[in-house]
Amino acid sequence: MRAPTDMPSGPERRERRRGAGRGRVFLVVAAVVLFLLATSLRGIAGFYTDYLFFDSLGLQKVWSGVLGARIILGLTFTGVFFVLLLINLIIADRLAPKFRPAGPEEELLERYHQAVGRRSGAVRVGVALLFAVIAGSGVSSQWNSWILFTHRVDFGVTDPLFDTDVGFYVFQLPFLSFVVNWLFAAFIIIFIVTAVAHYLNGGIRVQAPLQRVTPQVKAHLSVLLGILALIKAADYWLQRYELTTSTRGVVEGATYTDVNAQLPAIYLLLLIALLSFCLFIANIWRRGWVLPVLAVGLWAFVAIVAGGIYPTFIQRFQVQPAESTKERPYIRDNIEATRAAMNLGEVQTQTFEYDENLTAGDLIDNAETVGNIRLLDPGIVNDTYQRLQADRGFYRFNDLDVDRYEIDGRTTQVVIGARELNEAGVPQQTWEGKTLAFTHGYGAAMAPANAVNAAGQPDFVVSNVPVESPENIPIDQPQLYIGEDQTGYAIVGTNRQEVDYVSDDDETVPFEYDGEGGVRLDSFVRKAAFALRFGDIDPLISDFVEDNSRLIFLRDVRQRVETLAPFLRYDSDPYPVIVDGRVYYVLDAY
């Protein structure tokens, strides 16, 4: 045992405990920082590699434009919410009663105030900032609506219901509706947080026997409820315009029930919202909460009956029994709008005389049309293409399409499919095999849709590996690095030769990429960023990867195009075309 004189004194022991406590705090903080850094690095890598993708295609302005819109929206809405909530929290502190009568809740509240002490201002700012970040976190996803809103163009065509230019519905209504809905949700949060602040300050006493809410607090909360009513009134005003895209009736757009039941109900709800605003404001000078309860009760009743039950009743018992009569003018409006949108306003109707009895002369006179009657169905012959033309297990025909090409001097319907890479069939299921060696598909297969060979199989005009094709449909560069449902990534231009194809005698024919596609891996930072993005360290440490190597990712056609131009709507089926000796993909956009 140590002698008492050897024992540390009281101050020394306290100093050691403080030092140990500081050490534990440091370790906890360091662990939290390392965790946040590790989880955020991958996000930063994804952000940076997205920029490299756009930069490799010369589309930096698209990337920066979308990013700028996201930042503006996020900062603006976060800032607005922060200011609104902070103002209300400051008001709540200013309205706090100077004397809090003793009660069951006083002990708990006293502990809160002792803990906060003089840091109440910092607490207000911290709470406001926390909720502001939450409220503004998802706003950046509305960047497309914001860009449309700021670049409105009038179409010169008005809708038949409100006589408003169609450009308003395309460019402005979506963003305005979002803003109103966001404001309504924001003020609900502000109301709740403000009410909690009043409770902590003693302005609301749940267990008080008499006055549970001070007059000042009641006035503050009544104003917030009035603001909510005004925002909802604005929402009802915009809901009128949203009826023009209703899907309730037989056609898209406002139909009988929308115009004669839903629209009057919306006007009534708008008036109820304005009346509720007046009742909430009047409640400032009245005792109790009778007026707010009356307003909310009336509002809920009208919303259920007029906004829900009544339109449903009209649709079921007035419209459906006589739909052709009730909906006729709205169907006519829909047809006229469709013609205007498709530029079919000048359609001329002609009557053709025809005879249902087909003769040999008719067949001779229409030999070209008859000769192009399709015998091959893309959905049925896909397995045949796979069996006859996939050549190896690492190729596949994801899907076949119908197109027209000139064959033997005649425009002919053909069934065409791209011979894409099948990653699951790659013989070397290693990182090197799937990423460096087997990197691409090869060419296409094409057969006339109106003919088969003697064996009843497609009569291929473009076929085989290496590609065989007629002179007018050459394929000089058959390598396909992207495709339909193509996943993963490929690194090309490495010192490990790619497999172009395997010949009939099982000899591997190599290929060396000399194109400009993909992102150059010419720095440690780029290699590390892609390693983080894909959760794969090999791009960073592989000896095969050189400064001239390029990484090709986002290889699915639709995903790639949607990333580059997310403001368009795309058809679900890309289709391959052979142009200038190469296989391209076409994806229709609207």
Question: Can you say where each PLM-predicted feature lies in the sequence?
Answer:
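Soluble extracytoplasmic regions of secretory-pathway and membrane proteins
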Residues: 3-17, 24, 30-55, 59-590
